[in-house]
């Protein structure tokens, strides 16, 4: 009797174990729960091949297009531009803040489109441009706003004249001093020397250092508080460093013309000041003192007034619960009105066609 009971219990346990094993067996199903359908597996195409095989000559990229190494780390290629297709090998232009957006190629995520990262825009001549926006402030140049910085490329590229050194076979080569000048004879033209990039730097001997300094750049803002910079080695180590200073060309108030009172019988008022002193505001911090700066005025004719004399002052700013800091600032002392009118931030004001 005991043997029969033991065999019955053993058979019951084995039967339950087999049922559980069969019930836990995996079934092919789709994400929707339909049994019998296998999951679809996507395999991405391999775009990189090793060892690297690059063309003998580097590609020539159009103006404004970066020459970068491909995503495989092999060859130099022209970076993809906004709206171009991209992948792991064909990367987007990193110098323009571009990235490859694969959201339109789900679920493979193999091919994307170059798009701009979210970033701040640019302000140029009192006009605001969005990040990635292309604009043309000058007939000869096209500009692009990238994360608060402006980069420009020429619209017209002069065709290089044939070199005098390229002679037919069997001919004697031209003397080296005459090679590469072309028909424009740019070396004989003195017009390019009027550009600020070709002017001699201000030089001063100080101990054993020949002090050099570039001109201050135009103010980054045409109204309100801006920044200008220059490069100089006027420091203890006689090293070339970038210096920055604040600049306040004109207030951004629309009632500026009402604040300027031109005397009767005159056509210009070179300078003007605000009715009362006010504190400067910079990066959310305010100056410890109130100032009444001098601004350049206006003319009734087509003349414009620009700074003539200025000096540097030190302004201390206090920040709420974040301490204080000091900045050097341009302080205008006098202005002059002239016919040669240029925008304070016009980077094309000194362009000359060679």
UniProtKB/Swiss-Prot annotation:
Coiled-coil ranges per UniProt: none
Keywords: Disulfide bond, Glycoprotein, Growth factor, Mitochondrion, Secreted, Signal
Gene Ontology cellular-component terms listed: extracellular space; mitochondrion
GO annotation terms (biological process): negative regulation of angiogenesis; negative regulation of cell population proliferation; regulation of mitochondrial membrane potential; regulation of reactive oxygen species biosynthetic process
Position of the signal peptide: 1-23
Disulfide bonds: 48-72, 52-74, 54-75, 61-78, 86-100, 92-114, 209-238, 219-223, 247-252, 268-305, 285-319, 296-335, 299-337
Ranges of residues in domain IGFBP N-terminal: 44-117
Residue span(s) of domain TSP type-1: 208-253
Family to which this protein belongs: Belongs to the CCN family.
Function noted in UniProt: Plays a role in mitochondrial electron transport and mitochondrial respiration.
The protein, known as: Cellular communication network factor 6
Lineage: Eukaryota, Metazoa, Chordata, Craniata, Vertebrata
Gene name per UniProt: Ccn6
